[in-house]
From Swiss-Prot:
Keywords of the record: Disulfide bond, Electron transport, Redox-active center, Transport
Descriptive protein name: Thioredoxin
CDD domains referenced in this protein's UniProt entry, alphabetically: TRX_family
GO CC annotations, alphabetized: cytosol
Organism name: Thiocapsa roseopersicina
Annotated signal sequence range: none
Gene this chain is encoded by: trxA
Keyword field contains Electron transport: yes
A biological process from GO: cell redox homeostasis
Amino acid sequence: MSDSIVHVTDDSFEDEVLKSLEPVLVDYWADWCGPCKMIAPVLDEIAGEYAGRIKVAKLNIDENPNTPRRYGIRGIPTLMLSRQSEVEATK
């Protein structure tokens, strides 16, 4: 995993994502999720290639259930783009 990827929790989400000065791509994932593991190399590549321009963050939904619930995350993997404390897109 890229050193550029930030692991966030329910407690750190506001500081790491919502208060970030750069756009943040959040990957909602779980250890048991096969498709989550499949997109991990792509996220590593994005984190390295766009370091300093976009922050890539990962949030484990099993360990941090409050944030996914707050944003209506119902399935994984889900990617969410946040900019200036606003959710721009979720897929």
